[in-house]
Amino acid sequence: MCIPSNRRSAIAIEAPVLIVADINTLWRSCPFQALSGLRPVLGLAPMDPLIAMRHRRLPWGAKRGTQQKMTVLSIVLPFGWATRRAAEVLPRLWTAALKECRSVGADPSALVVTSPHYAPLVRDLSSEFPICYYCSDDYMNYAEWNSNEMRQQESVVVQNAKHSFFVSEALRDRAVKEYAIDPARGSVSMNATGEEFLAPVSDLEIDRLLSRFRKLTRPIAGVIGGISDRLDFDLIEKVAESDAVGSVLLVGPVAAGFKDARLDTLRRNPKCIFAGEQAHDALRVWLQAVDVVLIPFRSCHFNTMCSPMRLFDHLAAGRPIVATDACPQVREFQDCVMIASTDEEFLEKVKEVLSAPADSTYLELMRKRAREHTWAARALTLNSRIDAELEKAACKADSLQ
């Protein structure tokens, strides 16, 4: 279903529409943008009035747009729509979604929810409508969210969903254990990369980019992605102190409200260059501009559970990758990612990479692995599983008639 912004489609669409609530983060949006190439998808983007104004739109009403072939319906809801007022307000979101589908002559086929906050909606709809869960994060360990409430709400979602997709084995295994579901009702769908990250970047583009940062000196070690307490800043400092490294380039936003004295130390280090937040699709140039890419995750619960998008973008860029062993999913790619279990080993691997040109066979293996893990590839699996669940639901409905 593809509708130009603020206009209704001139052609009625008869194919059933998959509704996704919500697509408010990149890692929730990307899989369903890709899926929209295979089936009609309506992505919901609810927000409160303050967020709406930050997006430079009116703090009320609904607005229609597109992301690739996915129709996006952003709708302003009252403050507390996802928390204290969820049971009251979320039915409005569902009503708006149904209205949007029917405005183009289509019926909804299923609902995919992407966070435990939608538990009230799942509870209301699950007996009469197919629902799936797409879990892209360890919501119980979000610092700003109530862990017990998240566990209770996620239990409702997982137990009522026809199928749940988890971005890591750790998240899937925990759900099977804690919510006592049949393992067949949960599968792993890791994060991925866009095919645009596989495209080579010209020397001219790289030179133009690096010219903005005159203090950069090769060899360049890059830390590309969000900057938060998931990173080992002491290890990054040691990399910067290494004689094998000319500069450490950090590209990405600092997490809101995050402060750390060790990060401040990095900012004062003349060998560390901070480029700030960049558009995600622009990161492919940054990635191909560096000589080695680092994934310096520290040992923590969140890294144990996660599926780092940066891993897949890094693979697509075809630059050598050195990572700590803090994330089990990163370790699954040890055939093309150099994994270190100690700081000393990490530094030695960085030095090893920078001391000699990367083997072409190794770089091609990285790109091969990246091609296996694109969002388009993920969409094929998601589509197949959703179709299977819809077919089972239809057969069950027929048997009851």
Question: What feature does the model see in each segment?
Answer:
Residues 252, 260-285:
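Nucleotide-activated donor-binding/catalytic signature segment of Leloir-type glycosyltransferases, i.e.
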Residues 281-286, 293-315, 323-332:
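Nucleotide-sugar-dependent
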Residues 336-344, 351-358:
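Conserved acidic donor-binding segment of nucleotide-sugar-dependent glycosyltransferases
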